[in-house]
Amino acid sequence: MSVRLLDDIINIKGDGTGVAGLRSSFKFIMITVLGVALGWFFAVKLGFDTVHLPFIGDIALGWLMIPVFAFSVVATGNAVNISDGLDGLAGGLLMASFGAFGIIALLQGQFMLAGFCFTVIGAILAYLWFNIYPARFFMGDVGSFALGTSLGVVAMMTNAFFLLPIIGILFVVEAGSSAIQIFSKKVFKRKVFISAPIHHHLEAQGWPETKVTMRFWVIATVAAFVGVLVALAGGHILL
């Protein structure tokens, strides 16, 4: 979070060199180091060394839990950051995802974790009052990455790492479309999308900003509902 806060401050005030913000490589390294440190604490100090695969069971990872945890945190943080491109978009998607994991945590008996998820939802609701179109306030890198990394941590604490791509399917699509666009431009020297990530592609095709946002909210809500159903049927929750 501190890395993104510094980046936002530099972006706003400028440093006199004409370079906006911190270098992407520096931010990625620092965030990865943070993810590995959190993964080590999660695996070594808290003793978490398994992940649950829906309908299969627990998979023992041992020390591999550290890179898996780091990937969950770093990938989710960056995916949410990429999704924060339209008024109200990231906030709505995050509400759906935190809602799903909050329900899963509640049914698992992790009441403090569930309380955290629902508190985040309350905070996002207050934020969305001012962020829906036309937005007056924006979360910036510090907000999107803090919430994204928190979502990744919650997924690990509910032992639902493999549910994260289902519940957060639109984060996967957003980040994936950007990755595909970058790869295609560098390797094939052409673009797959008119603009990336996908929400800008839809805008370029003539969709109004509010239409993209509301339809993504609908998809995110359905994905969250499906994720909870998979958690119930797949063995994440023992009733």
Predicted regions and their residues:
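C-terminal domain-closing interface element
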Residues: 138-142, 154, 200-214
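Juxtamembrane boundary at the C-terminal end of a transmembrane helix
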Residues: 46-48, 226-239
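"…together with the soluble PPM/PP2C metallo-phosphatase catalytic core" -> "…together
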Residues: 1-138, 142-172
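Cytosolic, membrane-interface loops and tails of multi-pass inner-membrane proteins
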Residues: 6-20, 179-210
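Final/C-terminal transmembrane alpha-helix of multipass membrane proteins
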Residues: 211-231
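Transmembrane helix segments
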Residues: 170-180
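Short beta-alpha connecting loops at secondary-structure transitions
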Residues: 164, 183-187, 235-239
